[in-house]
Amino acid sequence: VEEHTRENIIRIMKELHYTPSQTARNLSMKSSSTVGVIVPEISNTFFGELFSGVEEITKRHNLSLLYSGNDNDMDTDYKALDMMKMQRVRGLLYIPAVNYSALGVLDKLQRKLDRMNCPIVCMDRDIGLKCDIVHFDDQSAVRKAVLALANEGHRKIAIIIGDKENILSVQRFEGYLEGLKKAGIPYDEDLVFRGTYTRVSGYQVTKQMIAKSKQPTAVITCNNLLSKGYIQAVCEHTHGKTDMYTHIGLDEIDMMQYLGIPYNCIQRDAYELGHSAAELLIKRLEQPDETFQHMILNSPLVHQTF
């Protein structure tokens, strides 16, 4: 383009307050400066912390972020992936919606991801994808929680957990069984309470547990939303007290710290998860031919009431 033509175009653009379309720019460049992030629930504070960790890294590299939620639903997950492909994201940080491996459709998902033609880092849930992976060892973490409670003399340890199809539920339940076995505590299915990973489900399942004749002395809740529902139900029953059972929750709850209420938890640092995943993605962008990495993050038990 001749210089005077270019100057005229720029002048007209300024007069009209024209902003170039990022989508059109991506299409012309066949790539973008945008990193896609797909998580189960954007509103969950755990994933808000994860986003902060991701942004810490992407800002350093002048990359913008495009978020989407999959609601732990396969169809919604596919739509989110299609949208990311259409936007030609430069890389993708991804938490699979469901256990595609157990459902027999892992190959279909892998082909879909391969067609995106960008680096992908799988976060939080290891379902066997061929890509970089970073997650916590939830199985080991729940096993440690059971043993910590057993060391305090508890023999009736209940668990409030998500549905059987969820890969995290599978791993956490295995940790629960391993902990019981190592502590010499017989497994009792009456102490297993299943729901979905939501606050409402945690509340409903806890109400069911409280109403049972066979009562636990300790309870493990398997994510922050289940823990919030559990606390709500217990506080209703005890008129504001949280110590009806000895309790360990998976993930921190900021609210407890702000209220000054002691809270036992398995600390899964969501910020570190996002930070580490973004670092892996940047490394993959810089070294695309390197062997895939599998990173397992530590999740210590933080206890304040025993």
List each model region and its residues.
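N-terminal helix-turn-helix DNA-binding module of bacterial transcription factors
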Residues: 1-33, 120
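Bacterial carbohydrate/catabolite-sensing allosteric modules
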Residues: 11, 15-16, 56-63, 82-91, ...
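Interdomain hinge and pocket-entrance segments immediately C-terminal to HTH DNA-binding domains
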Residues: 30-43, 61-63
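N-terminal winged-helix
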Residues: 39-56
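Short histidine/acidic/glycine/proline-rich micro-motifs that form metal-
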Residues: 41-43, 71-72, 97-101, 163-167
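Conserved ATP-dependent adenylate/AMP-binding module captured primarily in the ANL superfamily
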Residues: 75-79
